[in-house]
Each structure stands twice: as structure tokens, then as C-alpha cells.
């Protein structure tokens, strides 16, 4: 039986469609993502916590879902908005169709709406709070009330909500077409000990670090610098994550203490913003953020352009950078800051997602730079 669904934005705009997920309601910030593939990775990316994701590509669900493509242990997106759900999921790796997957994870989703109109609206007016109601006779007045009651992501610390409860180790490398997901590597195969802060870490980021010889100890977001330094790491990684970086004072304080040492530090996405804040810069909320797999970014030092995956609603304000932070990357879409490097410490960060899950691998050499800094640190400091 086909059930109705309704998406209402805080400005009162309504989109009527059909429910393809769980019955109920979902409230969050409505954003759009321009990736053509990777919907399962997007849904399970912790960076989408408290957000309703609109996918601009018209056909979503073609290849079904599977366990190997999940970026975390659960779906973090608050809700999903798509144009069309194919009748058949066809792929040799498919184990469950998208609609069943959404229902199993209790995710409210809507299909058969004009996603182009919605995307234009979000682009022109900026990201808006919204509410999806799925079920019999969805109440538009109730949906509008819920949308307007949502406080928004400004000032919202979500990293401590999505982080791991306990530290754990990670030694599994990347998926391959012929072998699938590999077995965990032995410790003697991984010469570098890296402590990774989990602010909402994606599995593929961890796998790409393991591919380069890193034995990872994943720690909760609120782990103190003292506890991490006792682990005697070769490097410290600051993961991606959701929400506003400014309220994460616990992380900023820890990073400032790391910067008093010579241990290499590498940040991605939220980790990039936190490194900037710890260095004295400021962050700003973007109009509608960057969400997609085709964003051109210029490496200003090498004068080359890379196509990157992006997923962030906040950015580092370049005008606030202190003298000891140099700009390494800038967005060619809007000129926003994409990369920084400390001039006095082996610490750097990148706003996009170089692990590219989903997306291109142009920025993957950033991981190699991290390893080079680790090797230099081991030679001089250990």
C-alpha cells in the first residue's frame, strides 16, 4: 500500500509525494547533495546528523544497498528526499532494496517530488529547516510547526553525540573489486601508530590511513590531550563530523596542547575547522554549504585543480587566519577556504573529503603528506 508523504520547509513551502521509508516524522536542516552515486555512503555519514538530505540526481536506489558500503554502523541522516525510486535494484552486490533499508533503519523518506525546484529554492534562500511527515493524511500545519521549532545547526555540538563511547583499534584496509573488504592487518604490518579522534569518523577515511601503514586507535571526541599523549602516537588525526565546530571547546583545547608538541596533526572536514579554531581563526555558517562529489578545488601552492567530495555547512573564515596559518587550497565554486597548513608545526587540514566516499580520489595524496610528516617526526623526535 502506497502511503503519502509531505515535506514542509520553515518558509511554508510544501512538497507532496509518497513515503518510501518509515512512517512518522523527521525534522532537520534540509540540504542538497549533487552526487550521482553513493547514496548509502551519504546516508551513513555521521556528518549528516540532524540533516534531511535531498539528492539532486533523479534516480536513487538503482543498485540497492549492502553492508560493505556503510560508512558507519547506522544511518545518521535525519531524512531523505529523492525524485524517483526505481522499481528494481540491480547490482551483483545488492542485498536489500533502498526502501526496505530505510524502513529497517526507521528513516523517514519522501519520493516523487520536484527535487530541482527544491534545490533551486535552497540555493537561492539558503539551507532551511524542514519536516517530513509520512503516513496517512500528513498534517501540513503540524509539519510547519515542527520545522519552525527546530533550532538549527548554529551553536549545535553534535560531535559528542555521534562519537564512539569507548576507544577501539582499527586495522582494516580498503575494499577492492576482486577481494571485497580485506581481513584486519596484523600490527607488525602497520608501522605508524595514529590516534584518531572520532568526531563522526567515516570508515573509508580510517581504511585509507591503514592502507598507508597506520595502526589506528580511535578515541571519543572528548578524550583529553593528556590521555592521547600517554599513548605515544606517531600522529594525530582529526576526523570529519556534524554540527557547528565552535562549541567543541573540549576538542579545541586538546588540539592546542597537541600543537605545543611536534606530533603531526591532520584534520578533515570538522577536523579542519577545529584545527583552524585551535590556531586562532574563526568559522562561519555557510548559506547552503557544500554537498557533492564534483567540487573543483585549487591547490594554490602547486597551481593545480582537483575535483573533490564535499560535505560541510560551516567554513573557516580566511580573513581571520593568524600569521602562522598559510592557505593551501581554495574552492573554485565560491572561493571559500579549503585547506590550511601551520607554518610553525607539522599540522595541516583539508575541508573536503579526500577519502572520496562517494567521489573522486584527486585529493588522496593528502594522506601521503601526513605519512611523510610522521616519518620525519619519527626520525627527529623519537
Curated annotation (Swiss-Prot):
Pfam families recorded: CPSase_sm_chain, GATase
Region: CPSase, residue numbers: 1-189
SMART domains, per the entry: CPSase_sm_chain
Alphabetically ordered keywords of this record: Amino-acid biosynthesis, Arginine biosynthesis, ATP-binding, Glutamine amidotransferase, Ligase, Nucleotide-binding, Pyrimidine biosynthesis
Gene3D superfamilies attached to this UniProt entry: 3.40.50.880, Carbamoyl-phosphate synthase small subunit, N-terminal domain (3.50.30.20)
Listed InterPro entries: Anth_synth/Amidotransfase (IPR050472), CarbamoylP_synth_ssu (IPR006274), CarbamoylP_synth_ssu_N (IPR002474), CarbP_synth_ssu_N_sf (IPR036480), Class_I_gatase-like (IPR029062), CPSase_GATase1 (IPR035686), GATASE (IPR017926)
Record domain Glutamine amidotransferase type-1: where: 193-380
PROSITE patterns registered for this protein in UniProt: GATASE_TYPE_1
Assigned protein family: Belongs to the CarA family.
Protein name per the record: Carbamoyl phosphate synthase small chain
Source species of the chain: Escherichia coli O6:H1 (strain CFT073 / ATCC 700928 / UPEC)
Lineage: Bacteria, Pseudomonadati, Pseudomonadota, Gammaproteobacteria, Enterobacterales
Amino acid at each position: 500500500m502506497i502511503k503519502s508523504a509531505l515535506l514542509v520547509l520553515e518558509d511554508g513551502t510544501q512538497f507532496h509525494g509518497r513515503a518510501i521509508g518509515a512512517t512518522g516524522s523527521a525534522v532537520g536542516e534540509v540540504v542538497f547533495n549533487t552526487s550521482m552515486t553513493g547514496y548509502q555512503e551519504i546516508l551513513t555519514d555521521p556528518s549528516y546528523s540532524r540533516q534531511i538530505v535531498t539528492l539532486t540526481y533523479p534516480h536513487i536506489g538503482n543498485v540497492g544497498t549492502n553492508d560493505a558500503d556503510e560508512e558507519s554502523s547506522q544511518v545518521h541522516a535525519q531524512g531523505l528526499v529523492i525524485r524517483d525510486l526505481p522499481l528494481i535494484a540491480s547490482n551483483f552486490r545488492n542485498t536489500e532494496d533502498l526502501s526496505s533499508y530505510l524502513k529497517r533503519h526507521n528513516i523517514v523518506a519522501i519520493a516523487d517530488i520536484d527535487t530541482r525546484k527544491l534545490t533551486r529554492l535552497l540555493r537561492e534562500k539558503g539551507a532551511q529547516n524542514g519536516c517530513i511527515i509520512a503516513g496517512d493524511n500528513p498534517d501540513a500545519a503540524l509539519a510547519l510547526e515542527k520545522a519552525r521549532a527546530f533550532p538549527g545547526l548554529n551553536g549545535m555540538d553534535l560531535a559528542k553525540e555521534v562519537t564512539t563511547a569507548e576507544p577501539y583499534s582499527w586495522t582494516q584496509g580498503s575494499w577492492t573489486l576482486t577481494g571485497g573488504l580485506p581481513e584486519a592487518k596484523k600490527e607488525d604490518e602497520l608501522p605508524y601508530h595514529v590516534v584518531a579522534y572520532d568526531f563522526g569518523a567515516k570508515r573509508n577515511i580510517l581504511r585509507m590511513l591503514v592502507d598507508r601503514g597506520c595502526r589506528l586507535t580511535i578515541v571519543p571526541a572528548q578524550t583529553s590531550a593528556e590521555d592521547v599523549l600517554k599513548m605515544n602516537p606517531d600522529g594525530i588525526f582529526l576526523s570529519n563530523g556534524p554540527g557547528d565546530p565552535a562549541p567543541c571547546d573540549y576538542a579545541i583545547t586538546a588540539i592546542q596542547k597537541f600543537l605545543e608538541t611536534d606530533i603531526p596533526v591532520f584534520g578533515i572536514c570538522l577536523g579542519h575547522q577545529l584545527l583552524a579554531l585551535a590556531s586562532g581563526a574563526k568559522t562561519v555558517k555557510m548559506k547552503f554549504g557544500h554537498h557533492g562529489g564534483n567540487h573543483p578545488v585549487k591547490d594554490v601552492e602547486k597551481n593545480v585543480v582537483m575535483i573533490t567530495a564535499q560535505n560541510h555547512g560551516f567554513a573557516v573564515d580566511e580573513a581571520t587566519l593568524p600569521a602562522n596559518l598559510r592557505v593551501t587550497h581554495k574552492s573554485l565554486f565560491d572561493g571559500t577556504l579549503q585547506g590550511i597548513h601551520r607554518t610553525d608545526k607539522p599540522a595541516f587540514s583539508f575541508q573536503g573529503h579526500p577519502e572520496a566516499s562517494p567521489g573522486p580520489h584527486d585529493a588522496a595524496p593528502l594522506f601521503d603528506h601526513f605519512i611523510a610528516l610522521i616519518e620525519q617526526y619519527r626520525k627527529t623526535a623519537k
